[in-house]
Regions:
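Accessible peptide chain termini
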Residues: 1-2, 28
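Active-/binding-site microenvironments in catalytic and ligand-binding cores
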Residues: 9-12, 21-183
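Small-residue-biased low-complexity repeat regions
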Residues: 2-16
Length: 183
């Protein structure tokens, strides 16, 4: 599994391009996936994966139900009975940055529905989702089905900063920005 990141490095750091090449050179059949109409900013989209896992690990709220991921700022909404305290928000931010700092590999793996690991929530997939799914792994920290663009390693994300939060009728919103890593 570690070779996917090395292969992706030859394709501008895009793990999905590296995986496609890996399948081509192995003469594997190209997976048939649903179309994806979003053009995410890979560092912010990968940070969203880490934030989702962190929120679920700490508060058992599942992944964000509503999100909007952009280069300038991003927001994720979580189903929670009450807002997080300022201290809890600082803990979330610190944990996300800790994971980013581990320089974890971000890889994709194509699997059939029968091969999905236990614990992966498929409830948000469209009803017409293909039989083959693309799982995105952020090291051993997170895994979920995803068609978006990601960085090759978490150290390419930069610093994660929660800039504001709000709470309305059981929905806790986190707005975050990224400071690009020093080159």
């Amino acid at each position: 599994m570690g070779h996917f990141g090395e292969i992706a490095g030859h394709f501008g750091g895009r793990a999905d391009a590296g995986m496609a090449y890996f399948q081509y050179i192995c003469n594997m059949e190209e997976p048939i996936l649903n179309s994806h109409n979003k053009d995410e900013y890979p560092p912010a989209h990968t940070a969203e994966h880490i934030l989702n896992r962190t929120m679920d690990n700490m508060f058992h709220c599942g992944r964000s139900r509503v999100n909007h991921i952009e280069r300038k700022k991003s927001k994720c909404n979580y189903d929670l009975p009450e807002p997080l305290t300022d201290e809890q928000v600082r803990q979330v931010e610190a944990r996300v940055n800790e994971v980013i700092g581990q320089d974890l590999p971000v890889i994709s793996k194509y699997v059939t529905r029968d091969e999905i690991p236990d614990g992966i929530d498929l409830s948000r997939l469209p009803q017409d989702a293909s039989e083959t799914l693309r799982l995105v792994y952020v090291g051993d920290y997170d895994v979920c089905p995803c068609l978006g663009s990601h960085v090759e390693h978490t150290s390419q994300i930069g610093e994660f900063r929660i800039t504001s939060t709000s709470f309305n009728e059981g929905s806790f919103r986190i707005v975050f920005r990224l400071t690009p890593p020093a080159e």
